[in-house]
Structures are given as structure tokens and as C-alpha cells.
Swiss-Prot record:
Disulfide bonds join C4-C37, C6-C30, C20-C38. Keywords: Disulfide bond, Ion channel impairing toxin, Nematocyst, Neurotoxin, Secreted, Toxin, Voltage-gated sodium channel impairing toxin. Has the CSbeta/beta fold, which comprises anti-parallel beta-sheets stabilized by three or four disulfide bonds. It holds the Pfam family Defensin_4. Binds to voltage-gated sodium channels (Nav), and slows down the inactivation of mammalian Nav1.2/SCN2A, Nav1.3/SCN3A Nav1.4/SCN4A, Nav1.6/SCN8A, insect DmNav1 and BgNav1 channels, and arachnid VdNav1 channel. This toxin acts by binding to site 3 of sodium channels. GO terms for molecular function: ion channel inhibitor activity; sodium channel regulator activity; toxin activity. It is found in: Secreted; Nematocyst. The keyword Methyltransferase does not apply. Negative results: has no effect on Nav1.5, Nav1.7 and Nav1.8 sodium channels and on Kv1.1, Kv1.2, Kv1.3, Kv1.4, Kv1.5, Kv1.6, Kv2.1, Kv3.1, Kv4.2, Kv4.3, Kv7.2, Kv7.4, Kv11.1/KCNH2/ERG1, and Shaker potassium channels. This is Delta-actitoxin-Ael2d. InterPro entries: BDS_K_chnl_tox, Myo_ane_neurotoxin_sf. GO terms for cellular component: extracellular region; nematocyst. Its main location: secreted.
Length: 42
């Protein structure tokens, strides 16, 4: 995936969705350009 930042926290950018994939163990997210940024990086 594409790296993105929630403040100073690096995450993975998911285009075209407003929710993080639930099976990857993400603990947080923030809204991002046309999608969502989910962290921590897996």
C-alpha cells in the first residue's frame, strides 16, 4: 500500500473506502484524501 500519515503516525492509505479492513489488526485511522489512512503499518 501507499504510506500516509495521521499526524506523526505512519499508516497505509486505502483509496475509496471510509473504513479499514478489519482482518489486518489496525488500531486506528484518520480520514485521508478520497479514502482512509490506517495504522499501524502491517
Amino acid at each position: 500500500g501507499t504510506p500516509c500519515y495521521c499526524g506523526k503516525t505512519i499508516g497505509i492509505y486505502w483509496f475509496g473506502t471510509k473504513t479499514c479492513p478489519s482482518n489486518r489488526g489496525y488500531t486506528g485511522s484518520c480520514g485521508y484524501f478520497l479514502g482512509i489512512c490506517c495504522y499501524p503499518v502491517d
